[in-house]
């Protein structure tokens, strides 16, 4: 470091730090300071020398400078004046230049703005168009415009990065969703309107079908020619004749929402979703439409609204199928129709089965017929509806039968069941017109004329024809052949007469107020009604335009009623016989009988004679049956009167009196009280009584015991136990003093012996 010189320090150009560090770290600071002093003095001398050398030149220069100073000042003034003048002159130019620059800049900016606006204008115009379309609910067109905006215009503006374009790009999905929701809302409103107007649409479709059914081919051709020749004027005139004739579903319902919604979902790529949603919504609506209103069974308007709503529903579906592509497919519609038809048939069947008004049922049938024809016009299968009508026909006939039961009851309640008498020709002809009856004897007879039947006969015959006509009304247009219709009407008529009317007659038969004479007249009336059966069949043939075919023999029509009547005749006579026997008043301890039959027997026989004579020739079979039943009952009464538990004693005289009464009855039976009976047929009913009384009176005990158990037995109908009961009553009577005096001891012994033997035989039988 000691070797460092001032020259070394001066030679350092870059960084003096190391040099100063070495100086400070060394011990030769004083030496370096001396060197620096010497160096400074050397430089001062050099400066002085140079100054002395150039001093004269400097003085000269100063002098020249002083000389130039005046000129410079003058020049300065001139320059300043010139500058001021130039400034004044150039100020306007500078202003104009600046204005020109600004104008050029504005012009450039305007050109750029115009160019930018030109590039943005299609997008803005497209957006304005979309906004207007959306405001007018032209959603499909709006989506198309939005698609153009998104795919064309906004794509071109991506490079410019406009904020409004970016905002539009962000808003487009939201706008699409809003459009979808708005169109879906319109679609829901459309579905609600469809549901509301379905009954009206169905009613118009049914009305149109009804009008078409009334028109023939000539009228259709004439109308077509009129439309061809008359053009629009003719069409307008035709439309004015009938306000609702040409109104269709699209006239009542605006179907544009479904088309718009379909197109919107197509643009959004959600067509399949829309189709599924539409079908599901319509299925749900079908369930609501198929729900019948409450208390529909007896409300015709409810039936009409219900049926029209279903018809309108499927008319709308058919229209959508034909106009909206695959929204309603054939398979979907067939499936919906099949399930809905089954539900519809079940509801109508259940409701109509509770209906008891044939007029309502007939109108329901007409509504269903019109709906069938309407459905057929739209291509729907309706076979199950025909089955429904056939089932309703059976129920309708049953309802008619119930109604005619009330009609018959009213007729029978008012009837006196006496032969009808007419006073003049007008009344006579009125009866002949209402009932097919011809009798020359009656026709030639003078007035007043007496018919063999009561007023009930023509009334019932007329009501039977009315019933047939009512049955025929329902069978019209049921795709049945005339023979099938005729068979149906005959079957219903047979049920009417054999079941309903016969049932009413059976009720009348059992009325206590009906006398035997009236009962017999009713039976006679039924015979005339049976004879009128072929005329009823002829009436059926005339209504159905078929050949005559008797389905049931007239004699069998009131078979059940006649059996009941025969039974009632027998019961009435037997009841009268019981009244006579209540007057018997036998003296069971009679010693000697008067020798004649009892008075009640004589009165009873007189009654039976007059009774049988009154209808034996009119009703021979019934008279014969009643006669058999009567004599059987008399025999049972005579037999039971001896075995009455209240009768404790029977004298021989009492037995003789009973024998006289029995003989009187046997004589009456042998006198053929009713023609046509076999000889001895009635006497057999008294045979048991005869054998018993003969055995008791004749006392042929040896014969009885000898023949007992053999085939040829004179007293084969008399059982030992029966004889024992009577003999014990005779023995009790013999205990009386009046009989003890006259009865011999051997008679008593004989009676005891007979009783022992009879009891022995009875014990063996047991």
UniProtKB/Swiss-Prot annotation:
Outcome of swapping residue 667 to A: Disrupts interaction with RAB11
Localization per record: Cell projection, Rhabdomere
Pfam families: EXOC6_Sec15_N, Sec15_C
Keywords: Cell projection, Coiled coil, Exocytosis, Protein transport, Transport
InterPro entries documented for this protein: EXOC6/Sec15, EXOC6/Sec15_C, EXOC6/Sec15_C_dom1, EXOC6_Sec15_N, EXOC6PINT-1/Sec15/Tip20_C_dom2
Record's GO cellular component terms: axon terminus; cytoplasmic vesicle; endosome; exocyst; recycling endosome; rhabdomere
Role according to the record: Component of the exocyst complex involved in the docking of exocytic vesicles with fusion sites on the plasma membrane.
The protein's name: Exocyst complex component 6
The gene coding this protein: Sec15
